[in-house]
UniProtKB/Swiss-Prot annotation:
Keywords: Nucleotide-binding. Belongs to the YajQ family. GO terms for molecular function: nucleotide binding. Nucleotide-binding protein. This is Nucleotide-binding protein SACE_6882.
Amino acid sequence: MADPSFDVVSKIDRQEVDNALNQAAKELANRFDFRGTGTRIQWSGEEAITLESETEERCKAAIDVFKEKLIKRGISLKAFDVGEPASSGRVYKVTGKLVQGIAQDVAKKISKKIRDEGPKGVQAQIQGDQLRVSGKKKDDLQTVIQLLKSSDFDVALQFENYR
């Protein structure tokens, strides 16, 4: 029998992000403090979201509304990288990108943390934009999952294919 293993990934459920975007757009259209400010939120390509408003403050408030909806939908804010409002004519625009996948340098940090602080006999292999963690006992893998959940990395981590 093969050793137990699991994958550490950073993925976003695009449908949940779309639901959060639609909820935020509905709230921006109905809220009293956003009336008449021309505040809009929409997709900008596959992995980016654009917010527009007449004032910088309304733009930042719209970002907060969208972040609140992301949290309610169970999406980590580490997966949403938002820039600063930039003026273009009479409108302020902000573009936020959805971050998926674990970068090589972050994967190395995670692997090093597992080697240094994790149980003995647990290995982590970097496989593209994810990590495969394997060990002799399932209890050791549970310990590694708890270790990674308690650590603060710059990406939202999920654990899948636990077998």
